[in-house]
Amino acid sequence: MSKQKNDTFLRACRGEKTDYVPVWYMRQAGRSQPEYRALKEKYSLFEITHQPELCAYVTRLPVEQYHVDAAILYKDIMSPLPAIGVDVEIKAGVGPVIANPIRSLADVEKLGEIHPEEDVPYVLETIKLLTTEQLNVPLIGFAGAPFTLASYMIEGGPSKNYNKTKAFMYAEPKAWFALMDKLADMTIRYVKAQIRAGASAIQIFDSWVGAVNVDDYRTFIKPTMARIFAALREENVPLIMFGVGASHLAKEWNDLPLDVIGLDWRLSIREARERGITKALQGNLDPAVLLAPWEVIEKRVKQILDEGMEQPGYIFNLGHGIFPEIQPETLKRLTAFIHDYTSRK
């Protein structure tokens, strides 16, 4: 039986009133904690995620240290790709590198299917361990969105402009949509398995979708996202969408059958609502602010919280993931401040 007690995050996802604003941080598991850095001297990311006890420990750390209102599973958006035949390596200082980039419809057709219980049992075991024994807050499962995964698979690694990805999308639409379908099927199976193992909410990360304009999003990406969220909706857990530099797509996300839209710092909470966004909102402090003096942090955070609390259905987060230079003590202090400031309003 789950020991989960604090459901403030889940209630905010559903647009309900809460006693205070819940908070969690993207990339809170790992990154800046000294305990995590010590582990990374011994193990790679994939080695940690393949060991449920170790992975659960890393996932649990920020809940215990920062007192956040939700945990997010420690893993990478690339984690399910080897199961469908993608040779991926996370290289230090570079990021994911793909040995066999997609170049044609034939390459797409070679991709297999994921069977989560057989291909990623360690992910499901970690979730079960956390949700039945260790956490008193909800656990967020997650996956990468097809566009972002496809961009790595086509570019062969990180990119600054996604030229190869967009060229493939424009020049090879049949292959593009075949790839979207393969990745959508993988995402649906992978995420449903996480939910059935015990994840209480799901976030879909479309990290690089800001590279496309609205028309291209509607044509080449949105139908796939609609299919994914419609399938996940059957599991009856809150669904969150997040992308970087993608404020121009927020209205498109608002059409999808999801619960929460995560914003980066380029679009304010108030402006999002003025644009007609009706979903619950999550965000959106620029993580770079956390390197500034506390008085600067507090001023920026108050402004975001004041806007967020204008309506129910708000979760505080960063506008992107924590980076290693951010001090754990800053995050602990920030969480306490958010809880205190919003519980007095």
Swiss-Prot record:
It comes from the Bacteria. The keyword Lyase applies. Its EC number is 4.1.1.37. GO terms for cellular component: cytosol. GO terms for molecular function: uroporphyrinogen decarboxylase activity. It catalyses: uroporphyrinogen III + 4 H(+) = coproporphyrinogen III + 4 CO2. Substrate binds at R27, Q28, A29, G30, R31, F46, D76, Y152, S207, H320. One of its GO terms (biological process) is protoporphyrinogen IX biosynthetic process. It holds the Pfam family URO-D. It is found in: Cytoplasm. PROSITE patterns: UROD_1 (PS00906), UROD_2 (PS00907). Pathway: Porphyrin-containing compound metabolism; protoporphyrin-IX biosynthesis; coproporphyrinogen-III from 5-aminolevulinate: step 4/4. The record marks D76 as: Transition state stabilizer. Keywords: Cytoplasm, Decarboxylase, Lyase, Porphyrin biosynthesis. The keyword Coiled coil does not apply. Catalyzes the decarboxylation of four acetate groups of uroporphyrinogen-III to yield coproporphyrinogen-III. Homodimer. PANTHER family: METHYLTETRAHYDROFOLATE:HOMOCYSTEINE METHYLTRANSFERASE RELATED, UROPORPHYRINOGEN DECARBOXYLASE. Belongs to the uroporphyrinogen decarboxylase family. This is Uroporphyrinogen decarboxylase. It comes from Geobacillus sp. (strain WCH70).
